[in-house]
Design a protein with these regions (language model features):
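Active-site core of glycosidic bond-cleaving carbohydrate-active enzymes
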Residues: 1-66, 72-77
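Carbohydrate-active enzyme catalytic cores, enriched for enzymes
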Residues: 15, 47-134
């Protein structure tokens, strides 16, 4: 089920099993959340036995996957009281880059990832970049 997959993958990221968690998350997104006709990830409520979409397709019932992008691939952890934004990137090897724009406090923070660096612009928080340890 989507919830079981999310909790399993999230647990792997939290236990710093980055390579395995990243590869399995990509696999799950491709096989469960990617719509080949629309060419985008989707978050359906469920699938029918014939693999047609079932239920609510508009409220992103299964949108917990966004945390796998933000906390998993992007490696984001933040604390407003401590004024910190910690980044431990683990985005997929198959991707050339990834970019996020996040509302933090009163500004939009831009974070761009590639395999050589992470560039953070306009963060109101102190940025702490860490390397993942596989």
């Amino acid at each position: 089920t989507p919830d079981t997959a999310y909790f399993t993958l999230d647990g792997m990221f939290k236990q710093q099993l980055y390579e395995t968690a990243t590869n399995l998350t990509v696999n799950h997104i491709i096989n469960y959340n990617y719509h080949s006709e629309w060419k985008i990830p989707i978050a359906p409520e469920a699938y029918r036995r014939d693999l047609k979409l079932f239920g609510d397709q508009y409220s992103n019932f299964n949108a917990g996957k966004i945390l796998l992008y933000l906390e998993g691939f992007a490696g984001l952890d933040y604390s407003i009281p401590d004024d910190n934004l910690t980044i431990i990137p683990s985005f997929p090897d198959e991707w050339d880059w990834m970019e996020l724009r996040l509302p933090i406090k009163n500004s939009w923070t831009r974070i761009r990832y590639n395999h050589d660096e992470v560039v953070v612009e306009n963060s109101p928080l102190r940025v702490i970049k860490k390397q993942r340890i596989d």
